[in-house]
Amino acid sequence: MFFGVMMVFSGKGLVGFRGWALVAACGAAVMASVVLVACGGGTTQQTVFKATRVLAFGDETSVLTPTGMKYAVNALDANAAVDCLANPLWIQTVAKIYTFVYPQCNPTASTEVKAFTLAAFGAQVNELRAQIDQQVSGGGGIGGGIGAGDLALVLVGANDVLALYAQYPTRSEADILTDARARGDLLAAQVNRLVNLGARVIVSSAIDMGVTPYAVAQKAAFTDTDRAALLTRITAALNGRMRVGILNDGRYVGLVLADEMVQTMVKSPASFALTNAVSVICNVALPNCTSKTLIDTATEATWLWADATHLSAAGQTRLGSLAQQRAQGNPF
């Protein structure tokens, strides 16, 4: 039991000499409760982080259009109108922890409009810096600055992978991977910048483009090399440098592994109640895809991909669940 307590406190670095003295004073009779409360006072050892604002950065995976449409599958209500609260984006799932809503999706006129996305369609890693600059300067129209109380959500990199892949074979794979690693370094630097500004950060690795329907098609179309495997290697190069470059401290940064998530979902779709993890579900271009514009017999809750490179509702839901776990489980 004592070993278990030591693991909790020393692992998170939250209690010093005074904390251990308090444990000793409590005595063996209450050792089992030390993990949760201090002896006699009922005060938690760790203050639970309560975000006062959620800020999302990155690409279209985190975009809500002005009318609440998503680059995924948009749900419809009984009147065939878009229900922007249903089939939530991962950033909406995280904001819901705090009862926050985004201004683009507030059909109930909630007063808790404290979640904002600066993400943009087509954004690459170098544009993440501009998004953060915009927020710091107050140019986003949502209240400037970034600081304590802000929870920043970051997901970018897929468009970088696709852009780099498009340069093959004009550029060698080695050159492309070097470029991808440099972009991973830049991504890590921007995550650390958010921490230095005072925010807590949940950053997701880029989705593995090598397991997408796009990758399946590319592999079938070219015989020079396994194009799907190449897309995975480019993704891994970017993600790998991001992972080693971000601040390795769970008090400030929570990491979501979206690349491993989609890899697992593709390998074992039944484990996630999926009936299809390799094909495209939408018959129209995003963000105009709705539950009424899907291929016959398909449902967004059981198909992984909305289009060739973007997650359907099933993928967004899983990603949101993982990010929510980080928001609630990390010692922010």
Can you name each region flagged by the protein language model?
Residues K12-G13, A32, D296-A298:
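Intrinsically disordered, low-complexity regions enriched in Ser/Pro/Gly/Gln/His and often acidic
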